[in-house]
Amino acid sequence: MRAGFLSGAVLYALGQGCTLLFQWLLLRQFGMQGYGEVGLAHLGLLTVLFLADLGYASLFLREDPASADWVVRWRRALWHRLLATLALDLAWVAGAWWQSGGQGEGFAYLLAALPATLLGLVGYSAPLLAQGRRLAGFGVQQVAMPAAIAAWLALRGMPGWEGGMGAGVAVSLGYLVQAVANVAVFGGPPRLLLPEAAGGGHMLGTGLRLSALGIAGTLHDRLTPFLLASAAPAFLPRYLFLGYLIGGASGVFNQFNRLLLAEAHNDPGARWTRSLVSLVLALSALGAQAVLAAAEAWGTAAQQAWLPWVMPVLATGAIVLSGGVLSAQLIGRHRESALLRVLVCGFSCSALLQLAAAAWHAPLPLLWSRLLCILGIAVASLQLCGLRLRPGGHAALWSLLLAAALWLGAGGWVLAAVLLVPVAWSAWRHRSLLYPAQETRP
C-alpha cells in the first residue's frame, strides 16, 4: 500500500511540475499583466472542474466497480456532474463577461477552455484505485497538462494561435487526450459515457457531504486572487504562480495524508501525524530564513520590494500543509463534522476580513488576515487531534511568523533566526515538536 501511494505521490509531483511549466510558458508568452488575466481564467477552469465533481471522486473510491448496480450509479453520477458543469460554466462565463466585457486574453482563454470542463467528466481514477490499480489510477489524472504543453508549443508558433484562444485550445486538447487515456486504461463498457437522468438523489447527498470540506477550502482559496485582482493587480501574477507552487506541494503531501485515513486510530498513524507536522514546521521556519537570506544576497531591488507580500503567502502555505495532515487525522477518526465547523468559522472570518481589506484597498492586511485565520484553524485542529506544541514547536511557529512580518524590521528577522535554536534542540532531544495532550510535557 505504501509503495502504491509513494508512486502516486511521484506521479502527482510530475503532473504538478508540468502544471508549473505550463504556467511559466504562459507567463513568458503574455508577460506579467497578460498572465494575470490568463492565469485567473485558468484558476476558474480548475475551480469548475473541482466543484463539478460533487464529491463523487471520494464516493466511488469506496465502491466496487464489479458490483451489480455500479454502472447505473456511475451513469447517474455522470448526469449530476454534467448538470453541475453546465451550470458552473454558465456562471463562469457570465462573471467573466461582467468583469471584462468579453474582451482580453483571459476571456478568449476561458471560451477556448470550456470544452475541457466537459472532457474532465471522463475520468476513471476513482474506480481504478478502488480496483487496487493504484499506479494507473494516479497516472490517468496527470495526462492533461503534459499533453497541453505539447499542444501549446505547437500552436503558439502558428499565426492567430499565439494568444489566449490558442492557450485555451491547447488545454482543451490536453483534456481530450486525458479522456481518451482514461477510457483506454479503464476499459469499461461504452455506456459509461451515457448519463442516466433517473434517480440518484441519495447518492448525490452522500457525495456532497463528502466534498463539503474540500468545497469550503476551495471557495476560500479562490476568493483571495479575485480580491487581489482589484486591490493589487500588480501582485496578482506573482500570487497565482506562488499558489500553483504551494498547491503542487500540498497535493504531493496529500498522497501521504491519505494513508492516515486508514491508520488514524493506530499508534503509527498518530506518530506519523506528529512527525509530519513537526517536519513542516521546522523546515518552514528554516526555509523562511533561507528565502530572506537569498533575497538579501542575490535579490534585485524589485524582488526585495515584493518580499513583504510574498512571505505571508509562503507562511500561509506552510500552515496549510500542517493543517492538511491534521485534517486527515480527524477525518480518519470520523470527526469531520467537528472539523467542518472549525473550517466554516475560520473561513467565514477570513472572508469577511479579506473583503473589508479589499474594500479599503489594503492588500497587505488582506494577506495577513488570511494567514492569521488559517493559523487559527490549524490551532483548533491541533486541539481536536489532542496534540500540543512543545516549546520548540512554539519557537518554530513564532520564527515563521516573525520572518513573514518584514514590517518589524531587522529586529524581527534576528529574533526569528534566534528562535531556530530551541527548534533544533527540541527536534534533536524529542524527535518531535508536538506531544499528545494526555502526556505530561517532558
Predicted regions and their residues:
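Signature of the first transmembrane helix
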Residues: 1-54, 149, 208-231, 419-424
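Transmembrane helical elements of multi-pass membrane transporters/channels
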Residues: 4-19, 144-145, 167-186, 190, ...
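Membrane-interface helix-capping segments at transmembrane helix termini in multi-pass transporters
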Residues: 30-40, 66-78, 86-116, 158-168, ...
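Helix-loop junctions and terminal segments of transmembrane helices
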Residues: 52-68, 130, 242-278, 329-332
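Alpha-helical transmembrane segments of multi-pass membrane transport and lipid-handling proteins
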Residues: 52-53, 78-103, 154-155, 253, ...
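Hydrophobic alpha-helical transmembrane segments
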Residues: 109-113, 139-190, 345-352, 362-386, ...
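Membrane-interface junctions at transmembrane-helix termini in multi-pass inner-membrane proteins
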Residues: 117-140, 263-265, 315-345, 385-387
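Membrane-proximal transmembrane or re-entrant/amphipathic helices at the cytosolic face
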Residues: 406-442
